[in-house]
């Protein structure tokens, strides 16, 4: 497709940019790529585009050799090495280039949460025991549909902006970043619970 003198890449429809930023890594769904001469302008989907460009911190991280702190993935033309894959969201197909001698057995998770107990302050979940249970293979779908712009520890930002004026702190830099956070889905969730015991259990591929 063409728009003016620029070219819009159709194979960028489901591509993602992985952006390394100091203490966290963001995943931005690419909306389109406009190529003009030797330059390319990339735009992203919301809500991650709005969050990424409104928050002041953290910023992209360059090293002394000016290596690029980002890369693009999930585009079929980039599938060129064993171990790489491409997910076509429109056709619900997964393309994978296997490594030499690799078995093609697949465990494809469908659930975000395997076990959930939710009580109230007045009536708590009480005295629950899990023994010799393997909790394995869950997924987290939000980044596929809303991108992922975290603050740290995997907690995603729902809104973030620069404080004006900033808050002065003694012996420290000015505090000028304000974020609202959400927590990723968990394989096991307990709310308002007491005396919950996990005995000889394992957690993996979550």
Question: What is each stretch, according to the model?
Answer:
Residues 1-192, 197-204:
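Extracellular polysaccharide-degrading/modifying enzymes targeting complex plant/algal/animal polysaccharides
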């Amino acid at each position: 497709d063409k728009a003016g003198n620029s070219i819009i890449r159709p194979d960028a429809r489901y591509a993602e940019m992985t952006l390394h930023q100091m203490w966290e890594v963001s995943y931005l769904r690419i909306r389109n790529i406009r190529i003009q001469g030797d330059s390319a302008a990339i735009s992203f989907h919301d809500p991650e585009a709005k969050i990424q460009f409104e928050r002041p911190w953290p910023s992209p991280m360059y090293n002394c050799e000016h290596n690029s702190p980002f890369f693009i993935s999930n585009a079929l033309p980039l599938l060129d090495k064993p171990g790489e894959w491409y997910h076509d969201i429109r056709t619900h197909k997964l393309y994978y280039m296997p490594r030499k001698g690799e078995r093609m057995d697949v465990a494809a998770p469908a659930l975000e949460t395997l076990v959930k107990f939710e009580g109230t302050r007045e009536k708590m979940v009480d005295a629950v025991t899990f023994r010799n249970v393997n909790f394995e293979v869950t997924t987290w779908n939000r980044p596929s549909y809303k991108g992922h712009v975290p603050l740290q520890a995997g907690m995603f930002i729902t809104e973030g902006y620069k404080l004006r004026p900033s808050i002065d702190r003694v012996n420290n830099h000015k505090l000028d970043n304000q974020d609202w956070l959400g927590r990723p889905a968990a394989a096991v969730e307990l709310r308002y619970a007491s005396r919950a015991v996990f005995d000889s259990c394992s957690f993996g591929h979550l």
